[in-house]
Curated annotation (Swiss-Prot):
Gene Ontology MF terms: diaminopimelate epimerase activity
Species of provenance: Rhodopseudomonas palustris (strain BisA53)
Protein's UniProt name: Diaminopimelate epimerase
Binding site for substrate: N17, Q47, N67, G77, N78, N164, N197, E215, R216, G225, S226
Any one cellular-component term (Gene Ontology): cytosol
Subunit structure as annotated in this protein's UniProt entry: Homodimer.
Main location class: cytoplasm
Function, as annotated: Catalyzes the stereoinversion of LL-2,6-diaminopimelate (L,L-DAP) to meso-diaminopimelate (meso-DAP), a precursor of L-lysine and an essential component of the bacterial peptidoglycan.
Amino acid sequence: MCTLANRSFAKMNGIGNEIVVLDLRDDPVAVTAAAARAIASQVPYDQLMVLQPPRAAGTAAFIRIYNNDGSESNACGNGMRCVAKQVFSGTDASALAFESRAGLLQCWRGAAPDIYTVDMGVPKFGWQDIPLAEEFRDTRMIELQIGPIDAPLLHTPSAVSMGNPHAIFWVDDVHAHDLGRFGPLLENHPIFPERANITLAHIVDRTHIVIRTWERGVGLTKACGSAACATAVAAVRLKRAERQVQISLPGGDLTIDWREADDHVLMTGGASFEFEGTLDPALFAGAA
């Protein structure tokens, strides 16, 4: 039987992003895609954050990130704030470092309770890095549309990698389009060989942007931290926003600061604890 049986987990929330944190640092075991899907059947989540023993010196853990369809992701900003809250609760440190498949991540306690800042790293804009299936010299706006050629419903998104691929469509009203219908079509468009997170973004002013996101491997979500980061940097590249902006998502607000000194993207927002539980052994009979 899979040794995940009876392991403790924490159910958490990152401004509407449903997160499960599974701390395996003291007794590590591999988590398969089937096991990740099985866990989602007991406690529904958007992302499963698995803490494994640290690999790099000075880090608190190596983080594996799973979507609820069992696929693995390189980045989840809202999930990282939840991880930070859990790990900070056992220490008086003001800063912690973690490692993921995307590299090293720094986290800090915020000025207010349950507020945390995560360094999401440096965004990538090269078509090979996002990645895209075709060469685009300028990924600030790529050739992609939904709808008739002469009257497209959505068109010319910005493309960005924040450790995972994002496409941001600029619209006047994020609620005027059926993202539940178009999201899966765009997520799986051939232009995105690794699929993509699809975001609708409305620029209110140079310091405030409203977004909705269809999250790769998840679907419609109340919050996607990496999408907020991708939107902020894409707007700056288009000269339509300042380097520090407020991003409003259905689940709440995030502050994104694209630091000019080193191009790192800092994301600040809330994380909350909901409940603890143990994994049902019956889930893993066929998921080992």
